[in-house]
Amino acid sequence: GGGHNMTVAERTAAGRELAPEMCSLNMGSMNFGLFPAAERFDHWKHAWEPEYLEGTRDFIFKNTFADIETILHDLGEANGTRFEFECYDVGHIHTLGHFLERGLVKPPLFVQFVLGVLGGIGASAENLMHMKRTADTVLGDAYRFSVLAAGRHQLRLVTLGAVLGGNVRVGLEDSLFIAKGEMAQSNAQQVAKIRRIL
């Protein structure tokens, strides 16, 4: 967690103190463009929202090899925390493979294929299958996966992910909608819908 101006020590402070069983770890630096969302709204609940979204036009989400090594040590080795490795593109899968080869991560690896964030791989069935094929090649049988397809693509690609052998993840963090134009009332509503589908 944490903000983009925080050091790795600041970003990991809560995890080091609370020692969670699992936390996410992004497998590389990337552009993380949320700014197109600012063009879709005229009214804001909070004054900071448009500036924050527009600020992502000139923002790099930083996770260097050194950052990742530090987090693997400080939260993983020293704290006993397992990781959900977030991969926003195929290069991130290769980065995870690098850490696996070096023995800095141990199977089973929990991989989250993240699709649909501007700056990462697009949200499509073809891209999800490409991510899966790449992970099969690079990680072999050392991993389990789930899918996060930001926004309107979530249920469709989570369903495909399940068909491909992945675990299922749904919730308001990933999509605010239960159907086209219809806001979800709760996480439970999304869980019930994916249970009906699968």
Question: Can you annotate each of these PLM segments?
Answer:
Residues A192-L198:
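Mid-to-C-terminal alpha-helical segments outside catalytic/metal-binding sites
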